[in-house]
Amino acid sequence: MSRLIVMSILIPLAATTLQPAPAVRARGAASGIMQGVVSTTRGNARQRIDDDKDGRDKRNKDDRDKDDDDALFPNQRAGHPDTTIVEKYSLVKIAQGSDPIENPSGLITKFGYLNDFPPRPVEATKTEPDENTYLVFKQNLGGPTPHYDYGRHFLFQGHENGSDLAYITRINLDVTDPAHRITLLTPVGSDGKTHFNSIDGSTWDPFTQTLLFTQENGSNGGVIEVTSDWPPTVRTLDGVLGKAGYEGIHPDDKGNLLIIEDSGGTTVNVDPSNPNSPKAARNPNSFVYRFVPNDPEDLSAGGKLQALQALIGGEPLKFVPVDATHPTGDVFSNAQLHLHTPGTTWPTHWITIHDTAVNGIATFDANAAAKAAGATPFKRPENAQFLPGSGFDTFFFCPTGDTNADSGNQPALAARGAWGSIFRVDFPGDAETGLLSIVVLGTAEQASFDNLAFLNSHTLLAAEDRGDTLHKQLNLLDSVWAFNVHSGSFHSSRSSSQRFIALGRDPQSELDAMLRDAGTPGFQNEGDNEPTGLHVSDGSASVHKILGKAANLNKARKFFTQQHGENIVYEIVRAHD
């Protein structure tokens, strides 16, 4: 084992099973109007979350015990309950699906809906805006209206719809005129298509001074590079970064890119001895990547694409296919059990799976390359975040797991990440060998982690994406959790986490879910709302202030998207702001 020491950890949670609780609306709810934008309700929770400069909880034990009666409870899957947030914060609506795009193109006319009903059966396609990137520029970026001042503060996001009609938008935060509030960056071509699908992740690369977006589209996915000027230049990087179901993407202070893949694996029976048992356990199939560019200021100049490899008991943990020799793949292996055992750490390192100096710049399948090289697969890791102030030596990532109670209710599978998990990776300095450790093993109560963002240097926010199947099985909607990152020791689960947001369900999402549950012919949209696009940033476009460098996030702005249904983007603000 390496002698490297993990400098801080998250608290593993007890593997308890949640009994669905009655829908309880948090006390202290209020609603109002802020700058012409609707603010949702907010509630209390048992433990206040501070985003002040030092991040310390200044309350005494009696105050904390008193708050135990004010916990924020999850919403049941019934009706359209409000979305609630812990005390001290409120939600301000920034944009919603029905908002107009100032430069419509083909079927792309609204922020969150395509203009395809009719003839599209049932209803218009929802475009599912996803990961947000907040940026502040010193100059007006310009737009389709000449000489118009679009401001200096912007929020960018990709949209996850398919059919070659996914697109990228820019919300002009300083603009109040609805006619110029939202700008389309990727208009359709002569055939009425953008030829993009499932645009999910987004980030700003301060070295290239460009935006990067990912397409979570399996072997047809990849990375899109977009300039911030007007009109923007758009190109793909398939010959350099490969094609895969990429989702999270994050630069470090050297210009390297951390890329997270979400590609669901083959499902197998939850009971290997019973062929009639549900096929709900997914074989680990997705990888954690790092791209080391030859020139940080020009990604097209090539470089090395690497993938994470962990050693369990001194042996590399590699992909095992589901086939005649391995009918359950690696789903039930001892190695997967060890990997997901809280309190353990495992040596890990980066292995090169593609080098443009050797392999050229032809398009390639990154997932296949990672498997061939012996990288370690995970159960759909969707996003990652660097620990603020860690010098980019530490990052967290979150496999979503199986999103199915048929799998999670099997103890052998729950112990192997069926409910989802959060891992931590440490590479101190320029060390070639790091440590991988599981810091949250999901449960029925805290499950299916999809999105991560640091609220401050010690509080990690994790959004759930359970999906309609798991929502129905447990009669619970999603939440956003806050986990305490603490240096040097474990804490009890009581003090390590709390529910930060209890997601509700808007009326459009309720209708979608009813149609989907009924199997309405031609229905093509998602059902229940999902929290996504968690993003906390001061908006700096500078290399010297790259997101993750500073430990102090006191001046950062906070955003998230209530995806599906009305497709609402919210800003999270302090209640007194």
Residue ranges and their predicted role:
Residues 1-4:
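Positively charged n-region of N-terminal signal peptides that target proteins for export
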Residues 6-16:
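Bacterial N-terminal signal peptides
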Residues 21-577:
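Sequence/structural signature of beta-propeller domains
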